[in-house]
Regions:
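Extended, well-ordered alpha-helical scaffold/bundle regions in very large, multi-domain proteins
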Residues: 77-125, 129
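Secondary-structure transition/capping motifs at alpha-helix termini
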Residues: 38-51, 74-87, 99, 134, ...
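Catalytic nucleotidyl-transfer cores of nucleotide-processing enzymes
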Residues: 1, 167-168, 173-196
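Alpha-helical support elements that line or immediately flank enzyme active sites
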Residues: 29-33, 69-78
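Core structural elements
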Residues: 57-69, 92-96
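Conserved small/polar residues in nucleotide/adenosyl-binding loops
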Residues: 198-205
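Polar, glycine-rich mid-to-C-terminal structural blocks
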Residues: 125-155
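Function-dense linear segments that define catalytic or interfacial modules
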Residues: 1-55
């Protein structure tokens, strides 16, 4: 009851942060479990069809835990391989970024994630290991750059990096915002073509054109 009583409580102290993390997980997991249950009613266990029937909009990073949670559900409950679960999850996720300030991007302390969501952290570690191995092929020995792009680094889980790396579509909230994401905040991902980064025209953009 405490988890769902007050949405987004005060999080300037450790207990508040942990409660917020639990809320993020609670709501994303409930949503995904409902979606999978409904999908199976219509299409059985043919999860190759899931990306054609379900796209989950990660509107800012708050629901970003949907990424490791969907992988967990597909592996632990549905018996899929890691490779298939990761591929399906990538094709199901679309991320909208709302800030261009790196310091405002959501991060979670590794210790808190390990303590609160140990299985989710295991999945994040494996995603990070695989992603960094791929990044090393493009940026050999550029450890600072790879660390900047990593999902886990410097004692924190970087939710924006997770969302960019594991979403088939990434967009900003306006054309200018999207351009800034391409040119600065997510520039290294953009160079790799690791994500489909595009811009969403706002009503003002449309009026000017």
């Amino acid at each position: 009851e405490v988890i769902s009583k007050v949405l987004y409580p005060e999080d300037k102290h450790y207990e508040g942060k942990m409660l917020r993390l639990k809320q993020h997980y609670f709501f994303t997991s409930a949503t995904l479990q409902y979606a999978i249950k409904n999908f199976k009613k219509h299409f059985g266990n043919n999860f190759d069809l899931l990306p054609d029937k379900c796209v989950f909009h990660i509107n800012d990073t708050h629901p970003g835990l949907a990424i490791p949670e969907l992988i967990r559900l597909l592996i632990d409950q549905e018996g899929l391989s890691w490779e298939m679960a990761q591929r399906i999850t990538y094709r199901c996720m679309a991320y909208t970024n709302h800030t261009v300030m790196a310091e405002a991007l959501e991060r979670w302390p590794v210790d808190m994630m390990k303590q609160t969501l140990p299985r989710i952290y295991m999945i994040l570690e494996e995603l990070n290991r695989r992603m960094c191995a791929e990044l090393f092929k493009s940026y050999p020995d550029q450890w600072e750059r790879i660390g900047h792009m990593a999902i886990i680094g410097y004692g924190q889980v970087h939710m924006a990096n997770l969302c960019v790396a594991m979403s088939f579509s990434v967009n900003g909230v306006s054309q200018l915002h999207g351009k800034i994401l391409q040119d600065s905040l997510f520039h290294d991902y953009w160079l790799l073509n690791n994500c489909l980064l595009y811009t969403s025209p706002s009503p003002r953009d449309t009026e000017r054109s």
